[in-house]
């Protein structure tokens, strides 16, 4: 869990902004949204497989862009 120590004479708004940024970096909100409802193991596998296919397609597309002729 992210924590923020208040510095001397630091406004609350600045500390709150630092806390929000640290939560964002730690992925707290994304984790909460992901765990909000139960997801069946088959759904988890299906989602992860779809993400892997998407990553692979993106990687192939990036590699093809390298070899594209620029004339």
Swiss-Prot record:
Signal peptide: none annotated. NCBIfam families: S21p. Keywords: Ribonucleoprotein, Ribosomal protein. Residues 48-59 have a biased composition (Basic residues). InterPro entries: Ribosomal_bS21, Ribosomal_bS21_CS, Ribosomal_bS21_sf. Residues 48-71 are annotated as: Disordered. The keyword Ribonucleoprotein applies. GO terms for cellular component: ribonucleoprotein complex; ribosome. This is Small ribosomal subunit protein bS21. Belongs to the bacterial ribosomal protein bS21 family.
């Amino acid at each position: 869990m992210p924590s923020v120590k208040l510095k001397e004479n630091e406004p609350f708004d600045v500390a709150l902004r630092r806390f929000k940024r640290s939560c964002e970096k730690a992925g707290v909100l994304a984790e909460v949204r992901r765990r909000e409802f139960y997801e069946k193991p088959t759904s988890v596998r299906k989602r992860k497989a779809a993400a892997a296919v998407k990553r692979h397609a993106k990687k192939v597309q990036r590699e093809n862009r390298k070899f594209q002729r620029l004339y």
